[in-house]
Swiss-Prot record:
Membrane-crossing segments per the record: 35-55
Protein known as: Cytochrome c oxidase assembly protein cox16, mitochondrial
Subcellular location: Mitochondrion inner membrane
Annotated membrane topology: Single-pass membrane protein
Native organism taxonomy: Eukaryota, Fungi, Dikarya, Ascomycota, Pezizomycotina
Record-stated family: Belongs to the COX16 family.
Species of provenance: Emericella nidulans (strain FGSC A4 / ATCC 38163 / CBS 112.46 / NRRL 194 / M139) (Aspergillus nidulans)
Chief localisation class: mitochondrion
Length: 134
């Protein structure tokens, strides 16, 4: 008698077998004969159905974003200081809005800063955290 018999092991079907076990056994028995019909086709159907389900969800996502981002009215733009310099038809400029001049002016302003004399300061570490010193 060979060490590994050619007959496959099957559990004895008893009355205590549930419907799920019977269906699983029938599925596993038919799967090698019809792999595309029993595995590939359901997989493709799930992918296609998922795309139909997710399409409205992504549309909803972009609609919510569009509701948040809206075009400013002229009055709101004036309140933010986005239109017109001071004195132009009574429009006031927002003092917090930074207006940068031309590039040359910005270059000279940055060059005037003293970048050579600075000191590195260490940040206070949490207890037990290594500070990186050797």
């Amino acid at each position: 008698m060979p060490a590994f018999p050619s007959k496959t092991y099957r559990r004895a079907t008893t009355a205590s077998s549930t419907l799920g076990e019977k269906l699983g056994e029938a599925y596993r028995a038919r799967l090698p004969r019809h792999p595309f019909l029993l595995f590939g086709l359901p997989f493709i159907m799930v992918i296609v159905a998922g795309s139909f389900v997710l399409t409205p969800a992504t549309a909803l996502r972009y609609e919510r974003y569009d509701r948040k981002v809206k075009q400013l009215s002229q009055e709101e733009a004036m309140d933010l200081g986005l239109k017109g310099p001071d004195g132009e038809e009574g429009i006031k400029r927002n003092p917090r809005r930074r207006i940068i001049g031309d590039d040359r002016e910005e270059y000279y302003r940055l060059m005037a800063k003293d970048l050579d004399s600075w000191e590195q300061k260490r940040v206070q570490r949490f207890k037990g955290e290594p500070d990186g010193r050797l």
